[in-house]
Amino acid sequence: MQADIVSYSNATNQVIRPSITNNAGVVIQPAVIFNYATGLNMIKYGGFFQMGKRFFDNRLGINAGIRTDMNDFTTSGSNPLRTLSPRLSLSYVLADKITLNASAGVYYKLAPYTSLGFKDAAGNYVNRGADYLRSTHYVAGLEYLPSDATRFTLEGFYKRYSQVPISVKDGISLSNLGGDFNVLGNEPITTNGTGRSFGFEFFAQQKLTQRFFGVFSYTYFNSKYSNVSGVLIPSTWDNRHLLSILLGFKLPRNWELGLKFRYQGGLPNTPYNETASRLNFITLGTGILDYTRLNSERLQAFHSSDIRIDKKWNYKKVTLDLFLDITNWYLAKSPAPPFYAFRRNADNTGFQTTDGLPVNTNGSNAVPFYLNNSDAVFAPTFGFIVEF
């Protein structure tokens, strides 16, 4: 059994649009400011049971369990049958160095606190009826251990999601948003969305022997969530390809060299609604995304590398390690969605227009353009470690 007391609060003061004044200081367009405060307290509780046993001279291992999660806040949160989640895992030694692993299970996750704590104008919690997000996992794979220092695994997975939160306002899954790291779920939601993901992972590891160690990992996956009409759309984090390589070398005279390389496929991207963006840019100061084409485009793939050099001095009672760690040493740019904007004039005193007149509030004479948001982050770090 387990129980947790949860306290959540959210206070927001956001300037949607600053006020605009003329040369005489008279306000010609008032500011739009969003003030919002909410909070909730709840008790989360539940229970689980698990057991395991080995058979056939320890060649077969079986672990089984069951779990339920409840809370005292949501409408159906106190019903243990709504979140009953069985799990089963198997491990079978096929040969001396080869093992087959498989597992299946159901998992539940409470809706985001931002959604549960959302209140309407009358102060009522509008998302108390939200269900727990349900996910069903199936995983199977092989593990090969040719030596104590070397390990290979190949694993495939399939996951199915239901009761996924969907925005009532936009009709899209919260799991298809979030690439810009904004707060999600602070709005009315329903929990009738679905989703699925599948893929495989290959992993290889060579532990330190003599002067070398290395780790290689490649994952392919496909992840989609439905909108309000049930159509599956690529999720915000659907990179498809993830590659990571870590290499380390111990050199003579206590020098060490480490190298890390990572690659990820392009993230899904939602284009701007050109018409709505032009009409509202002067008011909002930003473009408006076209949710009818949600995640229909992709950014470029990303790759970068880090390098680290260590030099150690070993004394009787202490070891001194000086290191230089350089993140993204070849200055790879991280792809990011562009910003929609109106082009400024040459002296940056206003917006450039097609007719030479002041920009219209509907943007009809403005010159829209996209501001590239991709940038390279280069971070060298020099430091030392003292071990006693």
Regions found by a protein language model. Name each.
Residues 39-75, 83-87, 96-138, 158-183, 203-222, 260-284, 336:
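Surface-exposed extracellular loop regions of Gram-negative outer-membrane beta-barrel proteins
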Residues 1-7, 47, 64-70, 102-106, ...:
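Transmembrane beta-barrel strands of outer-membrane/channel proteins
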Residues 55-57, 158-160, 181-273:
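Gram-negative outer-membrane beta-barrel transporters
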Residues 58-62, 97-100, 148-152, 211-214, ...:
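Repeated loop/turn-to-beta-strand initiation elements of outer-membrane beta-barrel proteins
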